[in-house]
């Protein structure tokens, strides 16, 4: 076959790909359901540590700052750095396979946390959890984008993002129920493992099911990749040519202002949210004298219900605005939610009564979650298909390094080194959350105009590739 004939064949394949209808809605929503289920498990495994602070500190002699390191930076560094090569892999290889292997991997390391006998061992296991979970979201965002047309993507991605809050809420509820058990019981002698504390058993229980449940990903079909530049027939199956890294870097440079405002703006909202979710349970234990079980159930319900409704509402609002001609709806929804958070997010740490703090946490949680379905949807909206996995991985790199990596740690360090009083954790939450939202609001506002220019640039890129 001549080079010109080959080029024509590839061009025809690409056009056919663009014209083919999206998969049927019932199956597309089934795929979102499976991905959300996997995401729920990832957040249960990620967040369960936050409800076991007291027994872990008791048995391993770990300070608040080191607990902040375990719940945040130790996980986030590996999650973020491995996300970029795994996101690049998701742009050309089997996305369902990447997710399935990652699911089994992080589940094994979650269970491995139950084998930890000291801080270093627990640190290493948390790093492994981070590596495994890095496989999930870049591939999931890419799959969802190829299953849904643009006017439905923000809702679909927001429903997937519900997994954050359902998983976190379940982790709090389940963790709260087992925290009393984990705190009170003596060590057990288990076969093979030896002396085991009840909090270690909790890690076994939440980690091991995922090893088998990873097989569920093989009920998901790989959809046709839309907007790819080159599709070659290999044994009757489509294959995707990976976009050279230099082209990806060049495209990102051309849109640098959009990425700066978007990624850092949403990362600071994540910084506030992760800091709050890590230390709100401890705040209620120290400030109001609640048990871990009581706050786990109360805050877990808030996260599972209010935060889940918030992220879906954000996506639905963005799609509603998009259908009515708002091209920047995904960014504007994040901006609006950030502004509306202030009266509630600044008030709940100052309440002298626990009941008032709980009441204010409901709208604060709703508004804090609303941006996190539209944020990844904005990335899919502005990036060419062959670069979406990598752009999503970079977004997750920034959001999780700043948010998950530093949020819990900065709250803990503010308590340990600024106030030097464990009872002042509520003031740490107030200061960290308020400053993060102020800077985020400014960045998202500034980023709207560059975002619109990026959408125009994508149209030009698509025309040039036709």
Identify the meaning behind each predicted range.
Residues 49-50, 255-311, 369-372, 376, ...:
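Extracytoplasmic gate region of multi-pass secondary transporters
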Residues 52-81:
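Extracellular/periplasmic helix-loop-helix junction of adjacent transmembrane segments
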Residues 160, 164-222:
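Helix-loop-helix hairpin linking two adjacent transmembrane segments in secondary transporters
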Residues 16-24, 223-261, 287:
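Juxtamembrane intracellular "pre-TM" segments in multi-pass secondary transporters
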């Amino acid at each position: 076959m001549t080079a010109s004939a080959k080029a024509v064949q590839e061009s025809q394949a690409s056009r056919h790909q663009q014209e083919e209808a999206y998969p049927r809605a019932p199956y597309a929503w089934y795929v979102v359901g499976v991905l959300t289920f996997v995401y729920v498990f990832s957040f249960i495994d990620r967040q369960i540590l936050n409800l076991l602070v007291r027994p872990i500190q008791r048995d391993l002699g770990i300070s608040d700052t080191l607990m902040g390191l375990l719940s945040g930076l130790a996980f986030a560094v590996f999650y973020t750095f491995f996300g970029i090569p795994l996101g690049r892999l998701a742009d050309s290889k089997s996305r369902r396979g990447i997710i399935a292997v990652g699911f089994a991997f992080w589940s094994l390391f979650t269970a491995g946390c139950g084998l930890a006998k000291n801080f270093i061992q627990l640190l290493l296991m948390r790093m492994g959890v981070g590596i495994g979970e890095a496989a999930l979201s870049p591939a999931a965002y890419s799959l969802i984008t190829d299953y849904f047309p643009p006017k439905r993507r923000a809702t679909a991605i927001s429903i997937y993002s519900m997994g954050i809050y359902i998983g976190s809420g379940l982790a709090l509820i389940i963790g709260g129920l087992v925290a009393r058990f984990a705190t009170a019981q003596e060590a057990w002698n288990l076969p093979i493992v030896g002396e085991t504390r009840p909090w270690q058993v909790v890690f076994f229980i939440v980690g091991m099911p995922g090893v088998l449940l990873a097989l569920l990903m093989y009920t998901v079909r790989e959809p046709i990749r839309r907007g790819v530049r080159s599709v070659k027939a290999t044994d009757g199956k489509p294959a995707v040519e990976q976009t050279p890294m230099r082209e990806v870097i060049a495209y990102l440079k051309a849109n640098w202002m959009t990425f700066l405002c978007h990624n850092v703006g949403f990362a600071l909202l994540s910084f506030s949210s992760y800091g709050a979710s890590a230390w709100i349970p401890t705040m209620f234990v120290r400030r109001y004298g609640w048990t871990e079980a009581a706050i786990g159930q109360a805050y877990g319900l808030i996260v599972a219900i209010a935060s889940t409704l918030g992220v879906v509402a954000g996506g639905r609002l963005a799609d509603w605005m998009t259908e009515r001609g708002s091209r920047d709806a995904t960014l504007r929804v994040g901006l609006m939610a950030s502004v509306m958070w202030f009266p509630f997010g600044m008030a709940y740490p100052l309440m002298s009564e626990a009941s008032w703090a709980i009441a204010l946490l409901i709208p604060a949680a709703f508004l804090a979650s609303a941006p996190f379905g539209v944020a990844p949807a904005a990335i899919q909206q502005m990036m060419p298909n062959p670069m979406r996995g990598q752009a999503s991985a970079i977004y997750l790199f920034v959001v999780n390094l700043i948010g998950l990596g530093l949020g819990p740690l900065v709250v803990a360090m503010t308590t340990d080194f600024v106030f030097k009083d464990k009872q002042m954790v509520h003031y740490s939450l107030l200061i960290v959350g308020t400053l993060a939202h102020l800077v985020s609001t400014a960045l998202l506002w500034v980023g709207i105009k560059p975002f619109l220019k990026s959408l125009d640039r994508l149209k030009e890129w698509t025309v040039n590739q036709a």
